[in-house]
Amino acid sequence: MSEGVLVLDADGRVRLVNQAFERLFTITGDIRGRTLMEALRLHQMQELVNTTLLKGQIEHFELELAALEGTRSLQVNSAVVLGGDGRQQGLILVCHDQTRLKQLENTRREFVANVSHELRTPLSMIKGYVETLLDGAKDKPEVATKFLQTIEKHADRLTYLIEDLLTISRLESGQLVMNLQRADLHGIAEHVVTDLGDRAVAKQVKLLNQVPVGLAAQADGERLRQVLFNLVDNAIKYGRTDGNVVIGGRKAEQPEVELWVRDDGPGIPPEAQPRVFERFYRVDKARSRDDGGTGLGLAIVKHIVQSHGGEVWVESEPGQGATFHFTLKPA
């Protein structure tokens, strides 16, 4: 069983303990015959036992434990053990590790808070400009045109955000099935270069497709194109003006194909690199929003690559650009 169980006798000494309890509390020796304080040295647990014995009813509380991997959250329940004569014969403690559940709940809260913020910002901007137009700005053609362009920009941002939210929701729920077949990687990269050509020209960035001709992988072509689009789009946004963005690829020594997108921008700080694939995480929050980013692009990249059975990672040194790598199964 996954729950940790410990039984105390009428004298308050450990009579029985299972392996799950020992794992939860990192117990290495035999604690049978010891008191709870001798075994665990946790005042909260002793207080729970005292309260349970005093009230004679089921008690429970949450216990936070320091562990090597971080804080562990336990739900602890206690109940008196009664004999045939109705007298107290001891007490039982049942502990359930709810760390993962807590983490998921925190992730859900953060996600809802982020979505609310991301939706509220463009909606507030649109509402503000519409009110200004209604107050008389519509009668000034130059001002009205500028305001309408801004409204369109924020409406587009809302559209991109909703599309990305739907995509990541389908990916995480497994509803988005990958149509795996032989994919021409050079050709897909060339499509992405064409799709983002105008943005690159506007930023004076040179796009280079260095994926070897003939390199192929087992992949969903449409989703792979989305992965490269997101990576190259980011590289254009955050790379330096008049710089280069390179799409490369090779057949790795292991039975896999590796692709990468490299820019020569300012790079990503070491402390930010482990988080860049998180939903809504932005290294430069203000700049990302100004550039119309949703904060979901790299999270989508990660989920699509993992749905292909591949891995994705980033390498970067401050001032030397960033390279995003990912692997696929060969065709």
Can you annotate each of these PLM segments?
Residues 32-100:
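PAS-family sensory/regulatory modules and their coupling/dimerization elements
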Residues 134-141:
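Short acidic helix/loop segment immediately C-terminal to the autophosphorylated histidine
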Residues 153-158:
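Short alpha-helical segment of the dimerization/phosphotransfer core of two-component systems
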Residues 185, 267-278:
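Short helix N-cap motif at coil->helix boundaries in the Bergerat
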Residues 309-310:
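Conserved glycine-rich
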